[in-house]
A protein has these predicted regions:
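A two-mode feature
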Residues: 63, 71-209
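Conserved short S/T/G-enriched processing/targeting/catalytic segments and their helical context
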Residues: 1-66, 113-120, 124, 128-131, ...
Length: 209
């Protein structure tokens, strides 16, 4: 099972997606890579899948990059690619607009794309390699709520997908909107908890009151 998430220019995203799902995509770099798969269904492992997406990004840049930049649009796109192929370990990659990529590790167990500066601090403080699925769901939604509150360009709904090791299928997929009872309860609880924590934090001892 392979999951591909994107952020950035929608036209570029769709062009990349077409290439990695097409049965006849061949990168200009094929001559340098033997037995390169033609689409995501043919990859032997997730690293090879990340390479394929990266090659597709560079191919789209060669085709559209200069025209986009001439119009001031820029070539901005990034992807998260994760999942598992039978017999291989689960892996997660972040692919940049240059086609290069990094992989999540035990020391850096999560990756983010898009508008993440508002929601990243809670993840940096709490998430680790042993974080449970339930805690991961809570933290992901709290992180998204922080982004939604601070950036008007980001909106609902939130699509949540859970994958468990070796299942090779979706464990759960849920679309969460503003009316979702759990999300409403969680954001209210988190807001109250932050206010309480702020009130209980010690006052500075170097300032006159």
């Amino acid at each position: 099972m392979i999951v591909l998430l994107s952020s950035g220019n929608l036209a570029v995203t769709q062009a990349v997606l077409h290439r990695v799902t097409s049965s006849n995509f061949k990168s200009n770099e094929d001559s340098e890579k033997k037995e390169l798969p033609q689409n995501l269904k043919e990859v032997a492992d997730l690293y090879q899948a990340a390479e394929l997406v990266g090659d597709a990004v560079r191919e789209v840049y060669q085709h559209d990059g200069k025209a986009l930049e001439a119009q001031g649009a820029g070539f901005q796109v990034s992807f998260l690619l994760g999942g598992q192929i039978r017999g291989e370990p689960m892996r997660l990659f972040q692919i940049y607009s240059a086609g290069n990529f990094i992989e999540a590790t035990t020391d850096t167990p999560f990756l983010q794309i898009g508008e993440h500066k508002y929601g990243k601090p809670i993840l940096d403080r709490v998430v680790n390699y042993r974080t449970s699925i339930q805690d991961g769901i809570k933290l992901a939604l709290i992180s998204m709520d922080s982004t939604l509150r601070s950036n008007l360009s980001v909106g609902m709904p939130v699509d949540l997908l859970i994958y468990q090791r070796d299942s090779l299928k979706q464990t759960m997929r849920r679309r969460i909107d503003e009316t979702d009872p759990y999300y409403q309860n969680l954001r209210g609880y988190w807001s109250s908890a932050l206010q309480q924590a702020y009130q209980q934090a010690p006052d500075p001892d170097w300032q006159d009151t």
